[in-house]
């Protein structure tokens, strides 16, 4: 039971780091502005990206939004077949699901209908009213351990109270390839 709880806590921390990590003593998240020349604060890390307002998912609006991911900061073209949209559960149910769900002629609902193939992932780490459109294969996260971390325990610390102390460790770091990944 303890090991499962520690692993879940580790997974939540990894999710937070990948989505919204500041880059200061933690990985750089997808929502951070890392373009060349941006100032890195020693107290708060990288600043958050400036949000782009999206009012609908019509091809004329969604296409240019996805096209921003197709060119790297150095001007090279990037090829991809699908993008990932990360949003929180409330925004998915209130905004994205109603805009991308349609009733089929067979009487069933087809969901997540986007003009460009898009996988929607829900994360509690994304702020309400925001979403992240990204290319997950362009985010590098290197681990020094297995993804489950390393669980250690000690009976020495609280020997007299007959209690065992557990801790979990994971060494890793990650960052997007460049500022155009998300």
Spans of features found by a protein language model:
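Intrinsically disordered or highly flexible coil/loop and linker segments, enriched in small
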Residues: 15-19, 23, 75-82, 175-179
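Alpha-helical scaffold segments that mediate packing/assembly in large oligomeric complexes
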Residues: 1-68, 182
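Sequence/fold signature of self-assembling virion shell proteins
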Residues: 4-8, 81-84, 89-182
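Extended alpha-helical or coil "stalk/linker/tether" regions that are enriched in polar/charged
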Residues: 46-87, 95-103, 108
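Feature targets compositionally biased, intrinsically disordered low-complexity regions
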Residues: 22, 28, 36, 44, ...
